């Protein structure tokens, strides 16, 4: 597989420092959310982990992806702006971000404006054990899966040639984006099984009453 030269922009921060600060920020969000989830109505560790996932993904959608959507000139920003630097670094794996390709701009717009707030609401729903939490998490996970598949598919249809090297292709484009395939798929499967079980119990109860 050949790859285009991509977008190798001069960065104010080293790649290692960007990954370190980004990683620390994400871990801090997870840690704080985990502590808070312990004071919630969540009934199991899995539900507490789900609260962490929805809080983390919601904040990423709203702030990180929202920054990309609503800052059209971020790639011209030469100041040591951490958020802009993150996107400049990621564009090494997908140069469509640097050119603000309509496909990624559309996907990121939906993610930041719609899926971000809904993900945060999902975290609240699990924490408060709301009756709609199963169907809500299932629906948002399907939407995330759809967006990620669309992201991969649009690149494939245009030649899948947007990374500056194989390293960035597999570590950034494939590796990071695959998280939004694997986790939503696991959550969607979990709640499909739970919703199906509830529907079956209701159906069996109805049949018993009729009989």
From Swiss-Prot:
Keywords: Isomerase, Lipid biosynthesis, Lipid metabolism, Membrane, Steroid biosynthesis, Steroid metabolism, Sterol biosynthesis, Sterol metabolism, Transmembrane, Transmembrane helix
Catalysed conversion reaction: 7,8-epoxymelianol = protoglabretal
EC class of the enzyme, as a word: isomerase
Source organism (scientific name): Citrus sinensis
BP term (GO), one: sterol biosynthetic process
Protein name as it appears in the record: Protoglabretal synthase MOI1
Entry EC no(s): 5.3.3.-
PROSITE patterns cross-referenced by the UniProt entry: EXPERA (PS51751)
């Amino acid at each position: 597989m050949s790859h285009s030269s991509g977008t190798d922009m001069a960065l104010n921060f080293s790649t290692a420092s960007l990954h370190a600060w980004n990683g620390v920020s994400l871990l801090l969000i997870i840690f704080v959310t985990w502590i808070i989830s312990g004071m919630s109505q969540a009934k199991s560790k899995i539900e507490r982990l789900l609260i962490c996932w929805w809080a983390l993904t919601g904040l990423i959608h709203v702030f990180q992806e929202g920054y990309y959507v609503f800052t059209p000139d971020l790639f011209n920003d030469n100041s040591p702006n951490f958020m802009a630097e993150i996107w400049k670094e990621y564009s090494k794996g997908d140069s469509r971000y640097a050119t603000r390709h309509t496909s990624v701009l559309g996907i990121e717009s939906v993610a930041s404006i719609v899926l971000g707030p809904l993900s945060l609401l999902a975290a609240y729903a699990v924490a408060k054990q709301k009756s709609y939490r199963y169907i809500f998490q299932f629906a948002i996970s399907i939407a995330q899966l759809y967006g990620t598949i669309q992201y991969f598919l649009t690149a494939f249809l245009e030649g899948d040639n947007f990374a500056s090297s194989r390293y960035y292709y597999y570590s950034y484009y494939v590796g990071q984006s695959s998280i939004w395939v694997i986790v939503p798929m696991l959550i969607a499967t979990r709640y499909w099984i739970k919703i199906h079980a509830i529907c079956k119990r209701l159906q069996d109860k109805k049949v018993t009453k009729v009989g």
